[in-house]
Amino acid sequence: MARVKRGVIARTRHKKILKQAKGYYGARSRVYRVAFQAVIKAGQYAYRDRRQRKRQFRQLWIARINAAARQNGISYSKFINGLKKASVEIDRKILADIAVFDKVAFTALVEKAKAALA
């Protein structure tokens, strides 16, 4: 049976991992064994954080809507309930944007929600 020489394949694999680890600190960007572990861990963090980003943005939007709603004398939960009863279908991302950049329009939405609750 012929001898299998894997030098070219190994070098290619090592170069690929070291390229992915470019910019990492110390041995993580220079030593293959350490870089491989760092790249694997980075992938795990990226996978986890792609899901967490969605949760974190929703939390941020809710916090902004709550703050703006309370300035207008209504809690977040009552505000959202009022909008649902008034059949206003604006998602939290847009509501948060309106709360930050267009106070007049947000106040109008609050009044609409209060009217639907009364």
UniProtKB/Swiss-Prot annotation:
A cellular component annotation (GO) from this entry: ribonucleoprotein complex
Biological process annotations from GO: ribosomal large subunit assembly; translation
UniProtKB keywords: Ribonucleoprotein, Ribosomal protein, RNA-binding, rRNA-binding
Listed NCBIfam families: rplT_bact (TIGR01032)
Protein name from the UniProt record: Large ribosomal subunit protein bL20
Annotated family: Belongs to the bacterial ribosomal protein bL20 family.
Function: Binds directly to 23S ribosomal RNA and is necessary for the in vitro assembly process of the 50S ribosomal subunit. It is not involved in the protein synthesizing functions of that subunit.
Classification via InterPro entries: Ribosomal_bL20 (IPR005813), RIBOSOMAL_L20_CS (IPR049946), Ribosomal_protein_bL20_C (IPR035566)
Keyword Electron transport set for record: no
SUPFAM superfamilies: Ribosomal protein L20
Gene: rplT
Gene Ontology molecular function, alphabetical: rRNA binding; structural constituent of ribosome
Source species, domain of life: Bacteria
Species this chain originates from: Shigella dysenteriae serotype 1 (strain Sd197)
Coiled coil: none
